[in-house]
Amino acid sequence: MAWFSRKKEEGAATRVNIAEGLWIKCDSCKEIMYRAEVERAGRICPKCRYPFRISARERLALLADPGSFEEREAGLTSTDPLGFKDARRYRERIRAASQKTGAEDAVICGIARIGGVPAVLCVFEFGFMGGSMGSVVGEKLARSIELAVAKHLPVVIVSASGGARMQEGILSLMQMAKTAAALERLAAEGLPYLSVLTDPTTGGVTASFAMLGDVILAEPRALIGFAGPRVIAETIRQPLPEGFQRSEFLLEHGQIDLIVDRRDLKDTLRRILAFFCEPTPPSE
């Protein structure tokens, strides 16, 4: 028998179970918002306009005309050439990333129409090992650019990457030269390359194809650079300027051409592509 018991107060608030995933926190303003409200806004924070990260498939749905995207090079997968192992085997990491994202590697490539203009479109999947560039990513990009040369099409690459994939060592670094060389052939044919930088675009991706666009666009507040700001600050032992390595800072210093809201990106790409190319009317 309990000698003491807490008297239940009338009208006391009862605990309400809230469905997991119903709310989402903005990484920028730290506000907690109703997830459905954020989804309706195109995965953009209604409070501060910060663009949340989205998957490659979501990005393709935003940019490609409905039903126009034809994926290419979908069967390429890494063979783990170094037999790499850290805390986990590289093969296990690839398998887990594929199960998590539904992608075979960190980039999805194909041909699409963007506002009626045919183009080769490549979109990074940051959820796949941080969008890192290994031999498969470099090969898919190089083949896609070669396809653009063969079909005389412009190229649009949407980057979201932490850089070269360390599990592939020098083979991943070689992809920087491979993609840059492919883009040189594209330029020799007089074909345009539009580079779209999203949060984050860093490391070997920034140091190669991401900054080689004829027109370089970025989403608001995207982190863009080679080494991260913390590493740079510790190396030079000096405070960094406010907003350093964010897209607004790069635009102010002439490193990129445009900052475009996600909801306006497709129309902006369409207008730029139409300047270089004749739009193809949709088939009846």
Model region roles, listed by residue range:
Residues M1-T14:
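N-terminal alpha-helical interaction blocks
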Residues W23, G42:
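Residues immediately within or flanking Cys/His clusters that coordinate Zn2+
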Residues C26-C29, C45-C48:
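Short cysteine-rich clusters marking metal-coordination/redox-active sites
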Residues I32-M33, P51-F52:
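Cys/His-rich microdomains that often coordinate metals
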Residues R53-M129:
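Long, charge-rich boundary regions
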Residues A112-V123, K140-A164:
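A structural preference for short, pocket-lining loop segments at secondary-structure junctions
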Residues F126, M133-S144, Q175-M176, A182:
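Conserved mixed alpha/beta catalytic, RNA-binding, or beta-rich assembly cores of soluble enzyme
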Residues S159-T280:
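Conserved catalytic cores of soluble enzyme domains
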